[in-house]
């Protein structure tokens, strides 16, 4: 009887442990790069992995993996919105009001607003024109190339810039090369890598030397609006806040900023600060230095804010 009771007890203990052992890791499937030279999202997926690792003891194992086929942003958002039927379940994008209605946002600025500091790729004759410009109104005489689905397309339009729209990221580089528009607005975090990747394909392509546009444009993680998405969002936010509390988030951000801005000289540029009409009240207060970077050291001392 004692042996039978002991066997029964062991059996119960083993059965109780099985669900935890057999539980499937939480999967995070994101879009792959648009091409082999596209490194724009590497930092964000590394931050995601660090956040998930930070609370592994609380939430269990996880898998972070790219989907096998590239997709543009419109398709990626639709796939996440499809929930269980979607081929991916997480994207990292600059937020806007419409996107926050469709998807579940985790409202923590992953790059502390760095994406909202914008510079231009231009052709030589455009730089010559810009050398003689001083005001925002003069800058607005030129056309800016944008993808129709990008968040800052609405921001720039609301600030009365002239836009030339396209649906293809690579196509915008080609259009600039044949002078279909004047300015290709790119984040300070991405412009140098993009210039390196395209300068040999587009003779004369250069990074504009004089101006910066700035507006608060945080990049968030987005997941489906369903039960699984809520579990994902809870875990991601918990992990990001753990990273912030430990100082790991700031360490990673500073290393990332140093890397992406290493070959750019921001000091001495004229900064035009614009309003972001697409920023919801979910965003952290703009004076919260934990989640926003004003780039004061990089823009000082010779920077003069445009009026």
Model region roles, listed by residue range:
Residues 239-307:
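An extracytoplasmic/periplasmic, membrane-proximal ligand-sensing/linker region
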Residues 25-41, 132-149, 182-183:
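Short loop->beta-strand "edge-of-pocket" segments that line small-molecule binding or catalytic clefts
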């Amino acid at each position: 009887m004692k042996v039978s009771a002991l066997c029964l007890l062991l059996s119960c203990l083993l059965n109780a442990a099985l669900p935890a052992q057999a539980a499937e890791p939480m999967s995070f499937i994101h879009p792959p790069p648009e091409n082999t030279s596209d490194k724009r999202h590497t930092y964000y997926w590394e931050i995601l992995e660090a956040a998930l690792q930070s609370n592994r003891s609380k939430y269990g194992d996880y898998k972070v993996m790219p989907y096998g086929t590239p997709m543009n942003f419109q398709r990626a958002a639709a796939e996440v919105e499809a929930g269980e039927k979607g081929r991916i379940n997480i994207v990292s994008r600059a937020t806007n009001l419409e996107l926050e209605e469709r998807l579940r946002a985790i409202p923590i600025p992953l790059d502390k607003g760095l994406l909202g500091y914008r510079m231009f790729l231009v052709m030589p004759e455009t730089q010559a024109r810009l050398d003689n410009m001083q005001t925002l109104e003069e800058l607005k005489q030129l056309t800016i190339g944008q993808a129709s689905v990008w968040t800052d397309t609405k921001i720039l339009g609301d600030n009365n810039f002239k836009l030339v729209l396209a649906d293809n990221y690579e196509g915008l580089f080609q259009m600039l090369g044949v002078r279909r528009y004047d300015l290709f607005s790119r984040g300070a975090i991405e412009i140098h890598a993009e210039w390196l990747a395209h300068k040999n394909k587009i003779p004369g392509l250069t990074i504009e030397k004089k101006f910066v546009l700035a507006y608060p444009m945080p990049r968030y993680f987005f997941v489906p609006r369903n039960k699984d998405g809520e579990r994902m969002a809870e875990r991601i936010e918990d992990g990001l806040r753990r990273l912030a509390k430990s100082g790991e988030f700031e360490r990673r951000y500073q290393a990332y900023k140093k890397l992406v801005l290493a070959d750019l000289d921001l000091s001495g540029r004229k900064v035009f600060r614009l309003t972001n009409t697409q920023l919801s009240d979910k965003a952290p207060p703009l004076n919260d230095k934990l989640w926003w970077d004003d780039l004061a050291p990089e823009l000082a001392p010779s920077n003069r804010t445009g009026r």
